Regions:
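Primarily mature extracellular domains of secreted and cell-surface proteins
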Residues: 1-253
Length: 253
C-alpha cells in the first residue's frame, strides 16, 4: 500500500489543481514549510486571518491492496466501478471543491465527491464508499465517508457517514496549495462497514490530499461535516465468510 500521487496520470477533469503558486502565497497566508503543524494544550483555535476556503481538491485512497486483490481474485471473482472518481496507480482519486484550511497549522477539512463500488461473489458482496472527507489537526485526523455494504444474503445495509479510518497526517501549505499524506488505520465503524474483512486498527492504504486554497473561509468550515452515521447496520455482514480462504492468505483480504 502506497500513497497515490495526485498530480500524475489520469485526472478527474481537465487540470490537476491548476494553481499559480507564485501568485497564491499572499492569498493563502504564505507557506508553512514542510511541517505538519498543530497545537499544544487544549483545543486548537481558529485564526480567521489565515483560514482559507478550498477551491479545488483531490483525495486519493486505495482502501487496501489486499482487498482489491481479493475482489478480483479467484474467490470473489469480482470487480469495481467508479462514479465521479478515477482509478490511478492503485488508488481511487476523488475530486471536489469543499472545505477550509487554517494555513498557520495547517489544520482543516478537505472534502471530495464521487464513489467506488466493489462487487464480488456473484453480486452478494457489494460495498460502496462515497464522498470522502479528510479532517486533520496537529498531525492527526480522520477519513470520513458514506459507506453501504451487503450482508451474506446480499441485503444492503447503509452505515451512513462514518469515520472509516484514523489518520496520522503530514501536511504543508506552499503557494496557496495544501499537500498532505496520511497513514490510515481502520476504525471499528470502518471494520463493520467493510464487512469485517479486517480488524479495527488494521493499517489500510495511505491517504493523499491536495487542495487549492482561495479567499477567506468561515472558521466553522474547518471541522467539516463529521461522522453522522451510527456506524452499525443491525448485524455483522460477514461477507468474508463467503469465500473459503486459503491457508497461505494468497486470495484472502
Amino acid at each position: 500500500d502506497r500513497a497515490p500521487d495526485l498530480t500524475l496520470g489520469t485526472t478527474p477533469g481537465p487540470r490537476v489543481l491548476g494553481v499559480d503558486r507564485s501568485a497564491g502565497a499572499g492569498a493563502a497566508g504564505g507557506g508553512t514549510g514542510g511541517t505538519s503543524g498543530g497545537t499544544s494544550g487544549g483545543a486548537p483555535t481558529c485564526d480567521a486571518s489565515t483560514t482559507r476556503r478550498v477551491s479545488e481538491s483531490r483525495i486519493g485512497w486505495g482502501v487496501k491492496d489486499s482487498f482489491r486483490s481479493y475482489i478480483r481474485g479467484s474467490v470473489a471473482k469480482g470487480s469495481w466501478t467508479t462514479d465521479g472518481a478515477v482509478e490511478n496507480g492503485g488508488a481511487f482519486i476523488f475530486s471536489g471543491a469543499e472545505g477550509a484550511v487554517d494555513t498557520s497549522g495547517p489544520r482543516g477539512t478537505v472534502a471530495a465527491r464521487g464513489s467506488v463500488t466493489f462487487t464480488g461473489h456473484g453480486g452478494t458482496l457489494r460495498t460502496v464508499v462515497a464522498d470522502p472527507e479528510v479532517t486533520f489537526s496537529g498531525g492527526t485526523g480522520t477519513l470520513t465517508a458514506d459507506v453501504t455494504s451487503n450482508d451474506t444474503q446480499g441485503t444492503p445495509h447503509a452505515y451512513g457517514r462514518i469515520a472509516v479510518a484514523d489518520l496520522t497526517v503530514t501536511a504543508s501549505v506552499d503557494g496557496g496549495v495544501l499537500d498532505g499524506t496520511a497513514e490510515a488505520t481502520l476504525t471499528q465503524a470502518g471494520a463493520n462497514a467493510l464487512s469485517d474483512f479486517y480488524e479495527p486498527g488494521t493499517v489500510m492504504s495511505p491517504v493523499s490530499v491536495r487542495a487549492a486554497l482561495a479567499g477567506a473561509a468561515d472558521c466553522g468550515a474547518l471541522d467539516g461535516s463529521g461522522a453522522t452515521g451510527a456506524g452499525t447496520a443491525g448485524s455483522t455482514p460477514d461477507v468474508a465468510s463467503l469465500g473459503a480462504l486459503p491457508a497461505d492468505g494468497s486470495s484472502a483480504p
